[in-house]
């Protein structure tokens, strides 16, 4: 009897020790990183910047697994349902995780706060508010005054209903008390073309695709939509410092793991991300792609995701934004 009890006790201890032992040995094989974007696209290139550094820090190869489609939902679902063993990581932007939950009529096949373990905010890509040179406003304060004097007369373009730069415009309207008409396009390039051509008056857009237009004077940038000025446009003030305190509308890339991934693994990946992102040569590469490198702690990124969820919930509710 005593012998049997001893055997069962040892078996129980072995079972309890298995996850800890696995985490201790991790990683002993390549790590899959799911990306919800097409291979070769700018977001894909930006996300992959951290791969060499992470491989060096962790001692294993990182293998990209591009699962584009559904606005990022396909990749997010695969990541959420993967084994929480540290061999599947997920790099995401806000669309699938903090925006779509508030726009979809049907429930998503995952819960952002329940099914993912935030690891680190890798980078943010601030939007800029750009206008056609014919718009008689040289700064954000003048634009707000113009919009209030002519309610419903100004318009702004976006890449489509419910996308990040559409909601950036809605946030601007809410925080400034202005009435600016939204015009959705099928993709940002078409909207940019119309702003350059004077057919659309303004829009929020990422910096890198419009650098040539800025230098040529075909568009004028009135403000940066992050809380800090951009290294790419250091002389352009933030919207927050231009009369709209707290205004922030950014794209971002963050690393996640499936929920219940051992904390020791989460912490090791976080340390590797932070060390990689903080390297001077890596920072220069991010800035060259129009992204500001961050490398946050687990706790900071967890709080960031919650704030982003709350922000977009409010924007969508007040604006009545819908997706196509």
Protein language model features and the residues they cover:
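Bacterial N-terminal signal peptides
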Residues: 6-17
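Hinge/capping helix and adjacent helix->loop/strand transition within the periplasmic-binding protein
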Residues: 81-86, 94, 102-190, 239, ...
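A ligand-binding cleft/hinge motif common to bilobed small-molecule-binding domains
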Residues: 97-105, 166, 171-175, 202-236
């Amino acid at each position: 009897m005593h012998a049997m009890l001893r055997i069962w006790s040892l078996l129980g201890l072995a079972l309890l020790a298995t996850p800890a032992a696995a985490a201790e040995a991790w990683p002993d094989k390549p790590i899959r990183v799911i990306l919800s974007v097409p291979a070769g696209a700018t977001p894909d290139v930006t996300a992959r910047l951290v791969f060499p550094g992470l491989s060096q820090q962790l001692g294993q190869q990182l293998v990209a697994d591009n699962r584009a489609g559904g606005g990022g939902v396909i990749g997010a679902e695969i990541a959420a349902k993967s084994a929480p063993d540290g061999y599947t990581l997920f790099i995401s932007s806000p669309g699938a995780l903090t925006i779509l939950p508030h726009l979809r009529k049907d429930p998503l096949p995952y819960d952002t706060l329940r099914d993912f373990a935030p690891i680190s905010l890798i980078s943010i890509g601030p939007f800029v508010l750009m206008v056609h040179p014919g718009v008689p406003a040289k700064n954000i304060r003048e634009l707000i005054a113009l919009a209030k004097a002519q309610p419903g007369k100004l318009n702004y373009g976006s890449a489509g209903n419910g996308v990040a730069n559409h909601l950036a415009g809605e946030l601007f309207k809410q925080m400034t008390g202005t009435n600016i008409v939204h015009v959705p396009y099928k993709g940002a390039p078409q909207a940019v073309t119309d702003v350059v051509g004077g057919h659309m008056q303004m829009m929020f857009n990422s910096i890198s695709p419009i650098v040539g237009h800025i230098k040529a004077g075909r568009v004028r940038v009135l403000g940066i939509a992050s809380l800090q000025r951009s290294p790419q446009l250091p002389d352009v003030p933030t919207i927050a410092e231009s009369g709209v305190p707290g205004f922030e509308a950014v794209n971002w890339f963050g690393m996640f793991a499936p929920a219940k991934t051992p904390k020791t693994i989460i912490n090791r990946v976080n340390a590797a991300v932070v060390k990689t992102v903080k390297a001077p040569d890596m920072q220069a590469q991010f800035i060259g792609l129009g992204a500001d490198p961050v490398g946050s702690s687990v706790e900071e990124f967890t709080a960031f995701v919650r704030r982003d969820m709350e922000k977009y919930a409010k924007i969508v509710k007040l604006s009545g934004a819908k997706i196509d």
